[in-house]
């Protein structure tokens, strides 16, 4: 989906999921360092990203316009966000930001992306 209002849909879903989910690490929730699942009431970064991806797929988005990105924050912590292709270009949906952000606007070191079932290294992504 890259229809005329796809950015607005992505913005709404980002806001809805960020408001609905309270951050809680996998260690706190599941007693394991990593457990990828869609967020219920609680979740960590990849759970937010998976929930946003699922909501966009349900809204008619094509899988090839969505990607789960693994990156590192300025402090070196692993982080996961959702890349989306919209009518206004490529944006990142991140649980740390209220609005979709351009990859170049974020202080992350990009590592890899899962898009349409294939992991790929990210070089020069931002």
Segments (PLM) and residue ranges:
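A structural boundary/capping signal
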Residues: 1-126
